[in-house]
Design a protein with these regions (language model features):
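Transmembrane helical bundles and short interhelical boundary loops of multi-pass, membrane-embedded
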Residues: 13, 169, 197-200
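Hydrophobic alpha-helical transmembrane segments and immediately flanking/interface helices
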Residues: 31, 181-191
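Alpha-helical transmembrane segments of helical membrane proteins, especially in multi-pass transport
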Residues: 71, 75, 110-123, 155-156
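Long extracytoplasmic/lumenal interhelical loops at the membrane interface
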Residues: 40-111, 127-138
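Membrane-interface junctions at the ends of membrane-embedded or membrane-associated helices
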Residues: 133-135, 187-200
Length: 200
């Protein structure tokens, strides 16, 4: 792990013009400070990862409690367009869409975030792997199908874990498609197991 951190930190430092006098470990520790600082705002106006959450907590009732509960509408935080920038980002003159969780809190509110996470979590809980069939009673194709379920499971969990870290799940349609495809595949596999085991 230490070797991986050192390599990543040195690559980060060389790619983004970091201070050559700093060690790889100090670059890594500085990046942790950026992640966990609750008041970190870059010169460009982009908020740090934790800062996005704390900023939302302090300013979410811009037009009343409805904004906190249901958000301010899709694209309200868009900072990547000069043609149609999000009006919440323009209102504060800040980049509020640095993480998917921040985007969701501003755009669909706390109710939307809870429903989104609860729906995925419910699928993962219900579809968690259980030993139902004996592998000796299954064909090779069935084993291959069942063997893919843990990969879909881990992929969906990884997508959920990315919400407070990156905006990628909200801005990449293909990743959203893959997330719902993985969840759908888990449901199909689970249903196939129930049918083959005689439980409906």
């Amino acid at each position: 792990i230490f070797a991986a951190i050192t390599i990543l930190a040195s690559n980060y430092s060389s790619a983004f013009g970091g201070d050559p006098t700093k060690s790889a470990l100090s670059v890594f520790i500085d990046s942790l400070g950026y992640i966990f600082d609750t008041n970190y705002i870059m010169e460009s106006g982009e908020l740090g990862r934790f800062t996005t959450i704390f900023f939302w907590l302090q300013h979410n009732e811009l037009f009343g409690p409805g904004g906190m509960l249901f958000g301010y509408g899709l694209n309200a935080t868009n900072s990547g367009s000069t043609v149609s920038p999000g009006y919440i980002g323009a209102w504060y003159h800040l980049i509020l869409d640095s993480t998917a969780l921040s985007m969701m809190l501003w755009e669909v509110g706390i109710i939307g975030v809870i429903l989104f996470i609860a729906m995925i979590a419910a699928i993962l809980i219900v579809m968690r792997p259980k030993e139902t069939l004996s592998r000796y009673d299954l064909k090779r194709e069935d084993l291959q199908l069942l063997s893919s379920a843990p990969a879909f499971y881990v992929f969906a969990i990884g997508c959920l874990l990315s919400l407070p870290y990156s905006q990628i799940l909200m801005i990449i349609p293909m990743l959203q498609f893959l997330l719902w495809l993985a969840l759908g595949a888990l449901i199909v596999i689970h249903r196939s197991v129930r049918l083959n085991s005689g439980t409906q």
